[in-house]
């Protein structure tokens, strides 16, 4: 456990990198503009270089290339300053471990397995035949229904809900208001009404998955909806039934993924994206915020953007410029048409 105050040499001993200048003590990470002498900050983007000169930060995390411009400052030189900053921030943000015990108002149904190392909060509910791993934290008013399986050190924040039969891997974190395993939107038209299709699958989340507040991941119609290891999903995201999401993909807020969509690994999906159902998105695809994805993306590594029609980011950026010039172009077109008409009249 690193102390609340630590020196630059202690940080580099834990995380690597090279410290330069004085081996000062720091107490927290702060932005360049707010940092004081007891803080460490970082420069990840060269366009903010001027802020370093004005910053009162006691130490700054920089790349080797940027370090040459800051002689006389206390530095930590790292290959990736932004990643290094994240790791330093983690050092100063203690991970809350489970305090073993079950609150008197919690309900643990017969047949549930709850190790002594787990923390079960006030009014939490653990269903029958559910198995919790070591060190889980099921906080106030959270619900884990029957026949679920949770790995070690899973955290359910207050009012999170995991429906029956779902599986969560190790170190999964579900934030408040999220619902894992509610019924998928499966309906068959019966001529004059809709007949609900029973959703008999479940949801499987891999290890190190994080689900934001008020996000919904629907259970599969017949097979499980799956989210791979290390994937992070923001607040207020809807994942439809039967979706398969690969490992280490990130999905930003307000995105809606329709049913039976397959998303690869290491994808980046911006906020407010919408997809049609039953399509595939290749590994390492980047989708810009607000994009409407209307067909499969089969080539890995593509950067896609645009509300409609979907296109590559390069094509979308070019077309966006044209959209802003449509009025001007229309006037020019009318002028040219008039000139052409006048020319014909004089012939």
From Swiss-Prot:
Keyword Secreted in record: no
Alphabetical keyword list: Acyltransferase, Lipid A biosynthesis, Lipid biosynthesis, Lipid metabolism, Repeat, Transferase
Catalytic activity annotation: a UDP-3-O-[(3R)-3-hydroxyacyl]-alpha-D-glucosamine + a (3R)-hydroxyacyl-[ACP] = a UDP-2-N,3-O-bis[(3R)-3-hydroxyacyl]-alpha-D-glucosamine + holo-[ACP] + H(+)
Keyword check for Kinase: no
Any one of the GO BP annotations: lipid A biosynthetic process
Stored InterPro entries: Hexapep (IPR001451), Hexapep_transf_CS (IPR018357), LpxD (IPR007691), Trimer_LpxA-like_sf (IPR011004), UDP_GlcNAc_AcTrfase_non-rep (IPR020573)
GO molecular function: N-acyltransferase activity
EC number: 2.3.1.191
Family: Belongs to the transferase hexapeptide repeat family. LpxD subfamily.
Subunit structure: Homotrimer.
Protein name listed in UniProt: UDP-3-O-acylglucosamine N-acyltransferase
Organism lineage: Bacteria, Pseudomonadati, Pseudomonadota, Betaproteobacteria, Neisseriales
Designated gene of the protein: lpxD
């Amino acid at each position: 456990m690193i102390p609340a105050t630590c020196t630059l040499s202690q940080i580099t001993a834990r995380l690597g990198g090279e410290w330069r200048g004085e081996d000062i003590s720091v107490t927290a990470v702060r932005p360049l503009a707010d940092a004081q002498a007891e803080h460490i900050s970082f420069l990840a983007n060269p366009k903010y270089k001027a802020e370093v000169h004005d910053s009162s930060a006691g130490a700054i995390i920089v790349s080797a290339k940027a370090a040459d411009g800051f002689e006389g400052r206390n530095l930590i030189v790292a290959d990736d300053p932004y990643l290094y900053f994240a790791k330093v921030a983690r050092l100063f943000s203690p991970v809350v471990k489970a305090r073993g015990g079950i609150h008197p108002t919690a309900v643990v149904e017969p047949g549930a397995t709850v190790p002594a190392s787990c923390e079960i909060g006030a009014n939490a509910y653990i269903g029958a035949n559910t198995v919790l791993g070591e060190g889980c934290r099921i906080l106030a008013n959270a619900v884990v229904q029957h026949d679920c399986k949770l790995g070690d050190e899973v955290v359910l924040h207050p009012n999170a809900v995991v429906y029956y039969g779902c599986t969560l891997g190790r170190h999964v974190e579900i934030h408040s208001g999220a619902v894992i395993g509610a019924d998928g939107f499966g309906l068959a038209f019966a001529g004059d009404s809709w007949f609900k299709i029973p959703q008999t699958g479940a949801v499987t989340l891999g290890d190190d998955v994080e689900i934001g507040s008020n996000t919904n991941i629907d259970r599969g119609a017949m097979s499980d909806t799956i989210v791979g290891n290390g994937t992070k999903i923001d607040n207020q995201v809807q994942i439809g039934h039967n979706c398969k999401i690969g490992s280490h993909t990130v999905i930003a807020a307000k995105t809606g993924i329709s049913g039976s969509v397959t998303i690869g690994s290491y994808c980046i999906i911006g906020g407010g994206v919408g997809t049609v159902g039953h399509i595939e998105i290749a590994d390492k695809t980047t989708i810009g915020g607000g994009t409407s994805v209307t067909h499969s993306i089969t080539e890995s590594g593509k950067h896609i953007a645009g509300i409609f029609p979907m296109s590559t980011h390069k094509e979308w950026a070019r077309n966006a410029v044209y959209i802003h010039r449509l009025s001007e172009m229309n006037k020019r077109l009318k002028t040219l048409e008039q000139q052409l008409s006048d020319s014909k009249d004089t012939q």
